Amino acid sequence: MIASVRGVVQLIGQDQVVIDVHGVGLAIAVPRTVLATIGAIGDTAQLYTHLHVREDMLALFGFSSPAQRALFELLLGVSGIGPKVALALLSAATPEELQHAIAREDITMLSKVPGIGKKTAARLVLELKGKFGVATISPQLSTNPGLLALNTELIDILTSLGYSTTEAQAALNALPADAPADTEERLRLALQYFGGV
């Protein structure tokens, strides 16, 4: 997987940028929110990327943070949502706004996004609501967006151990603010919350 790209901005389009990495121009589709922050042609830019593989093509999608990329990958896991619709969702709102809309079951807001009807918005809420939880976004995520991918992984681990999604989220929300951004250590602390260690 190509996890990130750093290079000189060669071209800025409506929904993509071309970044020159040592003489190779990579076309990277990006949300509009990223286009607004990419800088100008000739500037150096870094994007966190997702390589989408289909049998007939490879496509790179770029994001301003690992958390934004993690949310894109979560959206791709919802049936009926492909990369273009996931990109449209991230163009319409910040990751935090999307998470809040999903946690609040705000079908109206979600269905305003091009490519998302009421049925798809309802499916999105149904499949992802548990990922963000009753408490929606913990304060730790808003101050350190890189924890989104890590906490999503931890929720998956805890639910595979038999805890409910709500219990897993409660354990993660109870982690101290200075908890290290390390999967094993955060898992150990989460299990202590349950009295399992």
Swiss-Prot record:
- Which superkingdom, per the lineage? Bacteria
Its domain comment says:
Has three domains with a flexible linker between the domains II and III and assumes an 'L' shape. Domain III is highly mobile and contacts RuvB.
Keywords associated with the record: Cytoplasm, DNA damage, DNA recombination, DNA repair, DNA-binding
One GO CC annotation: cytoplasm
> Residues annotated as region Flexible linker?
144-153
Its biological purpose is as follows:
The RuvA-RuvB-RuvC complex processes Holliday junction (HJ) DNA during genetic recombination and DNA repair, while the RuvA-RuvB complex plays an important role in the rescue of blocked DNA replication forks via replication fork reversal (RFR). RuvA specifically binds to HJ cruciform DNA, conferring on it an open structure. The RuvB hexamer acts as an ATP-dependent pump, pulling dsDNA into and through the RuvAB complex. HJ branch migration allows RuvC to scan DNA until it finds its consensus sequence, where it cleaves and resolves the cruciform DNA.
Q: Where does it reside?
A: Cytoplasm
- The identity of this protein, by name, is Holliday junction branch migration complex subunit RuvA
User: What are the BP-aspect GO terms?
Assistant: DNA recombination; DNA repair
The region called Domain I is annotated at 1-64
Give the InterPro entries listed for this entry: DNA_helicase_Holl-junc_RuvA_I (IPR013849), Hlx-hairpin-Hlx_DNA-bd_motif (IPR003583), NA-bd_OB-fold (IPR012340), RuvA (IPR000085), RuvA_2-like (IPR010994), RuvA_C (IPR011114), RuvA_C_sf (IPR036267)
Map out region (Domain III) in residue numbers: 153-197
Task: Give the main location.
Answer: cytoplasm
